[in-house]
């Protein structure tokens, strides 16, 4: 579902929205689709090659995500529409790739992270 994908990607440092599609059987709280905010990416100065890397990260994470099988309640044994399992190896690789991209294109380049960590962490 869109909720599975958005949640798994968020765990890996990629933020997007889960959105309904026309005639979506899952409704607005689960959804079947996701929406990417490309203006945020281009505002950071990313271009075609970075978008290809983002697409690769998304593909990796979605390929490593599956619905969690419910283990209790009346739906025990059924796949959840909200909960998911994300392969830990996939998550680690995706986080590393996301970090590498954001190291090159920081969201807030004017922040002194060393100062903030020293005084507020």
Regions found by a protein language model. Name each.
Residues 1, 15, 47-48:
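Helix N-cap / loop-to-helix initiation motif
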Residues 1-11:
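Long hydrophobic segments that form regular secondary structure
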Residues 11-35:
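Conserved PLP cofactor-binding pocket of PLP-dependent enzymes
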Residues 28-121:
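PLP-dependent enzyme catalytic core of the Aspartate aminotransferase-like
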């Amino acid at each position: 579902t869109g909720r599975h994908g958005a949640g798994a990607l968020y765990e890996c440092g990629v933020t997007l929205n889960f959105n309904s599609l026309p005639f979506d059987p899952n409704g607005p709280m689960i959804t079947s689709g996701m929406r990417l905010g490309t203006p945020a990416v281009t505002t950071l100065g990313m271009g075609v090659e970075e978008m290809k890397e983002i697409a690769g990260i998304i593909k990796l994470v979605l390929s490593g995500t599956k619905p969690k099988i419910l283990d209790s309640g009346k739906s025990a044994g059924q796949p959840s529409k909200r909960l998911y399992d994300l392969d830990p190896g996939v998550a680690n690789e995706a986080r590393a790739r996301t970090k590498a991209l954001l190291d090159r294109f920081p969201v807030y380049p004017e922040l002194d992270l060393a100062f903030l960590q020293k005084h507020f962490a």
